[in-house]
From Swiss-Prot:
It holds the Pfam family Fer2. GO terms for molecular function: 2 iron, 2 sulfur cluster binding; electron transfer activity; metal ion binding. This is 2Fe-2S ferredoxin. InterPro entries: 2Fe-2S_ferredoxin-like_sf, 2Fe-2S_ferredoxin-type, Adrenodoxin-like, Adrenodoxin_Fe-S_BS, Beta-grasp_dom_sf. Residues 5-107 form the 2Fe-2S ferredoxin-type domain. The gene is fdxB. Binds 1 [2Fe-2S] cluster. Keywords: 2Fe-2S, Electron transport, Iron, Iron-sulfur, Metal-binding, Transport.
Amino acid sequence: MSGKIKVTFIVNDGEEKTVEAPIGLSILEITHSNDLDLEGACEGSLACATCHVILEEEFYNKLKKPTEAEEDMLDLAFGLTDTSRLGCQIILTEELDGIKVRLPSATRNIKL
């Protein structure tokens, strides 16, 4: 697990922030280590949808399909799109170099 890739985050005002991120970490971990606003209330345990992100189709298609548990949580996400994923479930790999990740302007945290 060595090496870094470029990840560009698009925040709700359209501003882009590009960071170098270590391969093997999740999008959720990268947002937290770079002071970007992505909640992750359940800390990556697939119990909420507050780390919902939107990907470009090119990169969405490079990921493994979401698990049933992730799809169940995505159903609760605010502003769901065809290329929505949970940031805690996207683990960075070399083929994701240059990925663009849109951070939604709002989240929905439903306590179960």
